[in-house]
């Protein structure tokens, strides 16, 4: 009897579980009819809807083992239909209550339905976007829109874009035509699209292979001119960019790991930023994400493990809750990892008629541990106005490194002695950032207001112990601590003027930086400095589009006051006042697949606060490094032109830098000791060019980028007997293999010839990386396996030619590694937070 009861209970349980899942097939059935059938057949949920409202929306799909809400969501697809579930009641409605709807079907050259094609309805007066939609699995689309007539623009990757004047809402069947190109007998189909924009280039990510690469940082590594090395991002010819995600400035490269590639719509790489950006900014990357319809709770969890002779790992958990009006985000990240360096150093000193040669081998091993917390919330007042605030904290804990060195010193060719040394370093940092914003409209005027407060500390304790029978023993204790405060506000107003858009605004920053450096033994000078800086900026930028042309011009004025204090006493000789005007001009043209752009601007690079401090760091008895309070900012004048055609892009530019800041080594007065710091030099010039090719061959999707750079800097004028004005060639081949939407692989080969940058000459280098990405359950689970520097060829190798001294470094940083990243996504949505922050470039200087 007992067994019978258990069997009955098991059968009932199985039956109940089975009843919660459905499998059905629909072929050109209206959603109204499909919902009616579900309502009649299943009593688990009550489905509320208006039959006439949803009758125009038709569905063709196969549903397998889904719950009723999941089945309805699959039927809805990209239709402008909203579903809410409360307890056991489901409400399905179309929020756009229009009297007319544009309907049609998208098919390919074989009359097969084309899912996920983009349909945009444009105004017949000015081609402005009115409404849009996406075709479903059956190629069907329905777009509510009151305006008539309209221009329909239908686009899909690998097919020609269709423009169609629609006088009727019944658009019928639209047949797409493939875009085929012959390249040496091989058929090449559509690829990531490049388009020149005002001051830069826009790259489409949505519906391209880039959307399947994993994270935003993986996408950036594939873009023309953008380089990613150890999570450090640079733009060729421009240096480190400011990065914005939906108008919010990136605070850490970890944000790029958190952003999924398939959430990205477009990425704009701006190489000639307008007047609204700080005068120090030479490059900007703006990432725009797709609109996501999911609301409620969403979760993303990343678990990473890597091995490069030591284990390192991180865990990240991001929780978000979204409604139509409100969003709150909490993102916690923790990292732990060991690292190492195998250094071989050699430096020559030419002092007082003596030639001193020092050879040093110094292996280093260290550990880094860090934690970050990000909390943000915003509220959408209406479609045009929103407010929000965010808080971010980053800190390190239990970080250390230890180096073991052996030096061999020769003087005038004779052995002087040997030194055995250990160097223990304990660094520590902590950062807090608070941002608030309002973004909205009053009439036709757009408003973007941001306020930022930043607090940070950076500490370091060094212990050097040197033993030498010939030269004597030394013990050197060094302690340093920097504390920084930043207050900033930024206001941008935009308004339509004479057919274009005018932006004007102001940015205010106030910075306090306090630094202390102590050397107990007095081998180098101790110091206590305070730097106070105020920057008041005003700017105006105007942009105008005329047919195929776009024009932009702007000017930014900055009034900067810097006060410098040493042990509390103001040092008038290194205090500075700057009053500068920075103009910019851009001209762009676009027609069909062709686009072209020309830009000119003036920028200024200000030294970071550490470079301005009056401190010396003890490296060994022959090498010190540190700051320079007399360092002046450098002015940068740039002109650049570029063009794109489909999957081909090219650019060439020229840069002239006045009062160039260069990292250089020179002899300290009356000593056989070198000091490495930044110094100003009269001018520095460079010419650069780049070309990128991204065709598509079925499964194989390569991207080839070739870069050319040549500096013009008279190093011989400063005592260097080498010609450093030689060209550098670099190349990167990104090989991508798309076996299916859920399985991809990549092989990256990159390298360069001998590189010249100021006084530094880098040796040729090449490296090979590989990766495999596999997703499951519609990207809910993603596994990424990577192998970096497979052949162990990536090394840090360079020679610095200085003033009375040279140094050569050959270092292996244990770049060869293998890693595994496991990602889980639940109801993943994009962030709505729109704050752009203020004083972003000033934070980078801190």
Segment roles from a protein language model:
Residues 90-95, 169-177, 185, 216-219, ...:
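N-terminal periplasmic accessory domains that precede
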Residues 35-42, 52, 79, 85, ...:
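Short, acidic, small-residue-rich periplasmic hinge/interaction motif at the N-terminus
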Residues 530-533, 573-576, 604-658, 674-687, ...:
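Outer-membrane beta-barrel signature, preferentially recognizing the C-terminal barrel domain
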Residues 17-98, 127-131, 191-197, 230-242:
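N-terminal export/assembly leaders
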Residues 125-140:
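Short, acidic Ser/Thr/Gly-rich low-complexity loop/linker segments typical of extracellular
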Residues 486-490, 535-537, 626, 632, ...:
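Outer membrane beta-barrel strand-and-loop segments of large Gram-negative receptors
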Residues 142-144, 216, 222-224, 248-274, ...:
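Short acidic/polar hinge/loop motifs at secondary-structure boundaries
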Residues 370-397, 422-567, 589-590, 594-595, ...:
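Face-selective signature of the C-terminal outer-membrane beta-barrel domain
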């Amino acid at each position: 009897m007992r067994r019978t009861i258990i069997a009955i209970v098991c059968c009932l349980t199985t039956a109940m579980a089975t009843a919660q899942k459905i499998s059905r097939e629909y072929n050109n059935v209206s959603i109204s009819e499909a919902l009616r059938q579900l309502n009649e057949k299943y009593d688990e949920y009550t489905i509320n809807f208006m039959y006439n409202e949803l009758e125009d929306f038709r569905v063709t799909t196969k549903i397998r083992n889904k719950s009723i809400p999941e089945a309805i969501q699959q039927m809805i697809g990209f239709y402008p239909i909203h579903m809410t579930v409360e307890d056991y009641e489901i409400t399905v409605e179309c929020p756009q209550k229009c009297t007319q709807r544009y309907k049609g079907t998208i098919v390919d050259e074989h009359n097969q339905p084309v899912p996920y094609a983009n349909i945009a309805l444009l105004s017949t007066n000015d081609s402005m976007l009115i409404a849009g939609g996406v075709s479903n699995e059956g190629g069907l689309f329905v777009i509510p829109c009151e305006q008539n007539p309209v221009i329909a623009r239908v686009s899909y990757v690998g097919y020609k874009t269709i423009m169609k004047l629609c006088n009727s809402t019944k658009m019928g069947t639209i047949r797409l035509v493939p875009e085929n190109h012959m390249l040496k007998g091989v058929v090449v189909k559509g690829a990531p699209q490049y388009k020149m924009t005002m001051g830069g280039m826009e790259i489409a990510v949505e519906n391209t292979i880039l959307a399947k690469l994993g994270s935003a940082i993986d996408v950036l590594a594939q873009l023309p001119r953008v380089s990613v090395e150890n999570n450090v991002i640079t733009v060729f010819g421009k240096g480190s960019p400011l990065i914005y995600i939906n108008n919010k400035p990136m605070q850490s490269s970890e944000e790029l790991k958190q952003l999924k590639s398939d959430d990205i719509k477009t990425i704009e790489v701006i190489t000639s930023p307008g007047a609204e950006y700080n005068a120090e900014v030479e490059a900007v990357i703006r990432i725009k994400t797709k609109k996501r319809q999911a609301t409620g709770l969403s979760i993303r969890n990343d678990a990473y493990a890597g091995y490069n002779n030591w284990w390192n790992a991180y865990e990240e958990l991001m929780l978000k809750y979204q409604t139509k009006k409100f969003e709150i985000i909490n993102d916690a990240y923790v990292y732990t990892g060991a690292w190492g360096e195998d250094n071989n150093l050699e430096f020559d000193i030419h002092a007082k008629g003596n030639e001193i040669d020092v050879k040093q081998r110094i292996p280093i091993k260290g550990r880094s541990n860090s934690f970050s917390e990000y909390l943000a919330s915003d509220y959408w007042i209406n479609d045009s106005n929103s407010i929000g605030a965010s808080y971010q904290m980053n800190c390190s804990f239990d970080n250390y490194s230890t180096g073991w060195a052996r030096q061999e010193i020769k003087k005038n060719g004779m052995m002087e002695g040997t030194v055995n040394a250990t160097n223990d370093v304990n660094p520590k940092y902590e950062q807090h950032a608070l941002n608030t914003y309002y973004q909205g409209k009053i009439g036709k005027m757009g408003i973007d207001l941001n306020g930022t407060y930043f607090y940070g500390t950076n500490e370091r304790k060094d212990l050097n112990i040197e033993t030498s029978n010939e030269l004597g023993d030394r013990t050197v204790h060094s302690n340093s601590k920097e504390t920084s405060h930043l207050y900033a506000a930024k206001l941008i107003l935009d308004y339509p003027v004479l057919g274009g858009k005018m932006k004007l605004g102001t940015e205010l920053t106030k910075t306090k930086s306090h630094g202390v450096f102590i050397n107990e033994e007095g081998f180098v000078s101790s110091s206590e400095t305070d730097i106070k800086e105020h920057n008041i900026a005003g700017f105006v930028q105007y942009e105008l589009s005329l047919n195929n042309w776009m024009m932009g011009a702007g000017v930014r004025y900055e009034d900067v006051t810097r006060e410098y204090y040493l042990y509390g006493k103001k040092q008038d000789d290194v205090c500075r006042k700057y009053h500068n005007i920075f103009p910019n001009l851009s001209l762009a043209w676009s027609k069909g697949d062709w686009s072209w752009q020309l830009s000119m601007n003036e920028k200024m690079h200000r030294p970071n606060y550490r470079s301005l401090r009056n401190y010396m760091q003890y490296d060994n008895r022959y090498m010190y490094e540190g700051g320079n309070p007399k360092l002046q900012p450098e002015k940068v004048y740039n002109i650049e032109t570029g063009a794109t055609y489909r999957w081909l892009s090219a650019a060439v530019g020229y840069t002239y830098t006045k009062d160039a800041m260069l990292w250089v080594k020179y002899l300290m007065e009356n000593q056989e000791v070198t000091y490495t710091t930044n110094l100003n030099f009269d001018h520095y010039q460079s010419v650069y060019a780049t070309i990128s090719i991204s065709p598509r061959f079925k499964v194989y999707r390569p991207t080839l980028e070739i870069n050319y750079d040549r500096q013009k800097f008279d190093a011989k004028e400063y005592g260097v007997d080498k010609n450093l004005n030689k060209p550098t060639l670099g190349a990167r081949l990104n090989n991508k293999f798309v076996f299916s939407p859920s399985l991809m692989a990549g092989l990256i080969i990159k390298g360069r010839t001998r590189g010249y940058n100021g006084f530094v000459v880098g040796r040729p280098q090449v490296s090979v990386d590989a990766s495999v990405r596999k997703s499951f359950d519609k990207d809910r689970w993603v596994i990424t396996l990577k192998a970096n520097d497979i052949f162990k060829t990536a090394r840090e190798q360079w020679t610095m030619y200085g003033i009375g001294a040279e140094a050569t470094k050959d270092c292996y940083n244990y770049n060869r590694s293998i890693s595994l990243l496991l990602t889980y996504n639940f109801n993943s949505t994009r962030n709505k937070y729109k704050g752009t922050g203020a004083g972003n470039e000033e934070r980078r200087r801190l």
